[in-house]
Amino acid sequence: MSFYRSWIGGTGDLVKKYTSSIKDDVELAEEVVRVMKGHVAHLVEIGSIPKEAGERIIKALEEVDASELLKEEFEDVHEALEKWLIDKLGEEIGGWVGLGRSRNDHVAAAIRLAALRKTERLKEEACRLRCALAKRALEYADCPMPSFTHFQPAQVITFGHYLLAIDELLAEFLHILRGVEDLLNRSPLGAGPAGGVRTPLDRRRLAELVGFKEVVENALYASGSRFFALALASAVVSFLAELSRAVDDFIRWNSPVVGYVNSPDSHVSTSSIMPHKRNLVTLEVLRARIAEALGHFAAMSALVMKVGMGYSLDLQEATRHLWAVLNIATEGMAVFRDFIENMAFNCEKSRKDAEAYFTTSSDTAEDEALKGVPFRKAYFQLASAIKAGTARLLTINEALKRPVYGSANTEEVKRAASRRLALCRPKPL
């Protein structure tokens, strides 16, 4: 029987399993223990519990194996931890841990801390991917290829330039994550169930003991809001949606019909009946899981938006969707990085296509305009010449000598990739 529920009556296994979050709490069990240690230490500091009792509780918390708390008989890991302490130390000692706290503020704190830990891992993976992209961008700085708009051959670029576009996405993602971290790194402890507690906690000192930088001021918002979780999931899902576009490109380019990408053997599978197939299954799964991440974010939003400002168990259900989004992103970036590090790009084929599909036409028209011909006139003259088969276009090497910052100019790509690589040694970014 669950510890708290025993005071109002028992329940059957069906209901107990249905409402318990214990399986999902594996994601934050260590943070729950960390929060409890800080809470008890502060209770001792302010003299609200006997010093000896507090010291014994903290010693026990240092010994507990968080994984041992994850038993189905409990509603959640918070209940399991309190019961474990009382069983180990007796009610006269362990019973003090309920003072000045609610599961509402403690679970919010644990989620924030676990999210910070997972965000740090996410940032590390993003930095590793950036370094892999920069290395390959330098390698392919002078490898021409068509860019595609409307999935039609457009302006000539290089594969190195393409890879640096993904790198810039990651740079912006990391910038957003740093802002979200500031939101996460605020303590709800001391907020109690909704309006604070009678115990004279110093909420800023308590935040410091647990490892938070700031405090969420309003107690109702501190315990009941999940805006921080939505903000993090939104940032991650927005990044994944954009990354999926590159994933889709590589899947298309892996087809021998296009023939741009030679995928590593470890990333491909074949057909059960067509032995010639080389299906890029890792990126297909990544593309699918990105779609799942969007679904998890939609579920989070739907769960939160119909709940009043105070805590409801609906918010418990929202948390597992946050973990799913973060895990999909972290694992997916690792897989994508391995692909980038080990794939090969067919520069001969991509150059051939760039030459065949008039990908220097815009540069040719611009050149004519810069020589004194009104651009639209030069544009229509070139269009007529292309249609007639008489166009004299700039070569790829000539077209790529664009002088603007951030262009596909080979030297510009090399400089940008080299700057990025310099940040990767010896420690990524």
UniProtKB/Swiss-Prot annotation:
Transmembrane segments: none annotated. Pfam families: Lyase_1. Keywords: Amino-acid biosynthesis, Arginine biosynthesis, Cytoplasm, Lyase. One of its GO terms (cellular component) is cytosol. Pathway: Amino-acid biosynthesis; L-arginine biosynthesis; L-arginine from L-ornithine and carbamoyl phosphate: step 3/3. It comes from Pyrobaculum aerophilum (strain ATCC 51768 / DSM 7523 / JCM 9630 / CIP 104966 / NBRC 100827 / IM2). The keyword DNA-binding does not apply. Its EC number is 4.3.2.1. It is an enzyme of class 4 (lyase). It catalyses: 2-(N(omega)-L-arginino)succinate = fumarate + L-arginine. Belongs to the lyase 1 family. Argininosuccinate lyase subfamily. InterPro entries: Argininosuccinate_lyase (IPR009049), Fumarase/histidase_N (IPR024083), Fumarate_lyase_fam (IPR000362), Fumarate_lyase_N (IPR022761), L-Aspartase-like (IPR008948). It is found in: Cytoplasm. GO terms for biological process: arginine biosynthetic process via ornithine; L-arginine biosynthetic process. GO terms for molecular function: argininosuccinate lyase activity. The gene is argH. This is Argininosuccinate lyase.
